[in-house]
């Protein structure tokens, strides 16, 4: 088994040392027989391998030459179309092994066509049959079959039954089509629209084969063949140029250039919302608001129950409560800030009263002062106030001057008359001048009594008798 597995490896890939070194058995042992004298332990020295081609004498060279001759004879019997000559070719220049034309029916599937066990099952062909294909012209080839190679010819497999490959210009995304001006962004989409409309209306452009296209595009165009009304397709094109057929069917065309067109580029920048905003009815909103007043945070069982009652989903109720709590929190913070600002505005006005309060307090104060003054005046009727006292003083001063003058005149006139008349004049003048209150009269008398002695020297300075000076004092 080991020799059978390594024999094709050495024979096909390297051909430097033959597989005969693995075993000396015959054809039944999956190898070929050699001369016992030539059987030797293989030498892996590069010098021996190089000298083997030159043909120097020696046991190693003889063994390698014998092995090459045996390998040539063996491969020549198996492959009649290939000529192996040991003298002309060196083991350093391996000859390619060509697979046979026909495979036997009893050939196991796991064996390689180049293995030794595979070559043992092949029948020996007579030499007359080997030369017959060379003399007679070859028969016409069958579709899908491999032809046996001839000597000196190169095997070129080709499929005669397949359709001819479409040209690069006919393909939708061929090299010539891509490099042409149709993919220039400055060029309009007239050619693309013309090709698509011709395909959609049932007619195909010349040279385009659906079999040559990819299966996805072929199935797409084959399904659109029954459509024959071009007006239904071209009507949105005239109204909205961006709504083109290429924009509608951009995913159906294969290739990386399907999404790099001018119309499809802005489409990538637009963000599509994967969800739509839920619109609640008035009944649902009232039910949610009533539950929110009772309970700001709902548990999962309560949320499911509320959603079932209102005809909503669990996610909708959850999101509504989250948004409602956020709104409630913001309103609460705004109210607290408003109250704080109001308190801060009232604090500086608390120490100093406002103008309105000052005006309100001033009349009350004046009224209180008036009441107190009236009460004082009522309780002290006989006692004059400060103003009355000052007025009385001024009046007394004025009256004293008059009295002085009158007294002086009286005294002057009294100098020749009797003392009684002068006393009566002075008393009458004093009584006539005192028409005010009793306090003013008393103050007048006191003032007169105080002021008369000051004028006494002026009165008495003249040549008067001492009796005249004593008369007003005794009377007053």
Swiss-Prot record:
UniProt key word Glycosyltransferase: no
A GO-annotated cellular component: nucleus
DNA-binding span(s): 273-332
Comp. bias regions, Acidic residues: 369-379
BP-aspect Gene Ontology terms: animal organ development; cell population proliferation; embryonic digestive tract morphogenesis; enteric nervous system development; epithelial cell proliferation; liver development; negative regulation of T-helper 2 cell differentiation; organ growth
SMART domains named in the record: HOX
Xref: Gene3D superfamilies: Homeodomain-like
Cellular localisation: Nucleus
Region feature (Disordered): 121-170, 328-401, 413-476
Biased amino acid composition, Basic and acidic residues: 331-346, 355-368, 386-397
GO molecular function: DNA-binding transcription factor activity, RNA polymerase II-specific; sequence-specific DNA binding
The keyword DNA-binding is annotated on this UniProt entry: yes
Composition bias type Low complexity, residue spans: 158-168, 413-446
Functional summary from the UniProt entry: Transcription factor required for TBX21/T-bet-dependent maturation of Th1 cells as well as maintenance of Th1-specific gene expression. Involved in embryogenesis and hematopoiesis.
Family stated for the protein in its record: Belongs to the H2.0 homeobox family.
Protein's recorded name: H2.0-like homeobox protein
Species lineage: Eukaryota, Metazoa, Chordata, Craniata, Vertebrata
